């Protein structure tokens, strides 16, 4: 059961709704949620996800991992291209945990320069995934 303050936050303070996950998570609730901000990480993110995937399979069945691929609206083209490659590869990879990908990098979804960065990417992910977390009363 979501407590009153958390419910108020979810209803009023969530990040802009233009950032949506690539799919709706298959189940609810999850015991564990891992949020990963991803900026120009093609060479690293897959090692991180493989490391998570090597954990206890019973735990992974109840784990939701959210990767928010992000950049600012005035980002260098090479970073945007790196983020696009990362997104495409993530869509095709399979893991023992559920993976959600959030596009905060493409046209019309890139972050405004004044709010861009790891903190905003993490907020987007947490805001979207918090309602899938198992909360103890």
Where are these regions (language model features)?
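N-proximal low-complexity "stem/linker" segments adjacent to membrane-targeting elements
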Residues: 1-68
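Short acidic, S/G/P-rich loop/turn micro-motifs used as interaction or catalytic elements
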Residues: 39-44, 72-75, 108
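Short beta-strand/loop segment that forms part of the nucleotide-sugar
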Residues: 61-73, 100-107
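Active-site-proximal specificity loops/subdomain of glycosyltransferases
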Residues: 6-20, 76-137
């Amino acid at each position: 059961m979501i407590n009153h303050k958390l419910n108020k936050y979810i209803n009023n303070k969530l990040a802009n709704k233009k950032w949506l996950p690539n799919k709706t998570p298959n189940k609810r609730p999850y015991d564990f949620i891992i949020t990963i901000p991803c900026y120009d990480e093609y060479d690293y993110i897959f090692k991180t996800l493989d490391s998570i995937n090597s954990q206890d399979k019973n735990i992974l069945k109840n784990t939701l991992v959210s990767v928010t691929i992000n950049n600012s609206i005035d980002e260098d083209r090479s970073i945007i291209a790196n983020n696009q490659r990362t997104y495409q590869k993530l869509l095709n990879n399979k893991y023992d945990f559920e993976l959600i990908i959030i596009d905060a990098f493409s046209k019309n979804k890139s972050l405004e320069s004044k709010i861009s960065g790891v903190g905003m990417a993490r907020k987007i992910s947490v805001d979207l995934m918090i309602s899938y977390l198992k909360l103890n009363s």
